[in-house]
Regions:
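N-terminal "domain-start" segment that seeds a small globular fold
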Residues: 1-27, 49, 53, 143-146
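Short active-site neighborhood of thiol/selenol oxidoreductases, capturing the structured segment around
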Residues: 25-54
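Short internal beta-strands
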Residues: 67-73
């Protein structure tokens, strides 16, 4: 699967199992919900902090018909351990073997994941994306979400 994402393009679909056992199909959000995909490099020292901060934003997104999905570049066991370090994680955390990250252009040539966030609208189109530290900042995400969800 090659890099197929970008603002204005159809979001690559996927089905994945979250660490809580729920099955997530990106298509389930079409029609009523915006999906907010956050690619999180779990080896980064700030991964736990980013998850905790994003968890607070997830509740706000939910109230505006947005579902945050965390996508981790780690095994199920590693993702479960990371999720366990964040009290009351408010969004699904999905382990990824690189397949989803590659489809969204979040996979570096060395196999590591870039910190990236994508907002997918109700029609399944990517309407916003960010890369780097700003991609994991709740304030940046909430500002962008309010803008595109009008």
């Amino acid at each position: 699967m090659g890099y197929t994402s970008g603002v204005g393009r159809e979001a690559p679909t996927f089905v994945a199992s979250a660490v809580d056992g729920s099955e997530i199909n990106l298509k389930q959000y079409r029609g009523d919900w915006f999906a907010v995909l956050v690619f999180l490099p779990t080896q980064a020292a700030s991964a736990e902090t980013a998850l905790a901060q994003l968890s607070g934003a997830a509740d706000n997104l939910w109230g505006m018909r947005g579902q945050l999905l965390g996508i981790c570049d780690a095994s199920r066991e590693e993702c479960t351990t990371l999720a366990g370090k964040v009290a009351d994680l408010a969004f699904p955390l999905l382990p990824d073997d690189g397949t989803i990250a590659q489809a969204y252009g979040a996979l570096k040539p060395n196999g590591e994941v870039r910190a990236m966030t994508f907002i997918v609208d109700r029609a399944g189109k990517i309407v916003w994306m960010s890369e780097g530290d700003a991609a994991l900042k709740p304030a940046t995400l909430m500002t962008a979400f309010r803008e595109v969800a009008r």
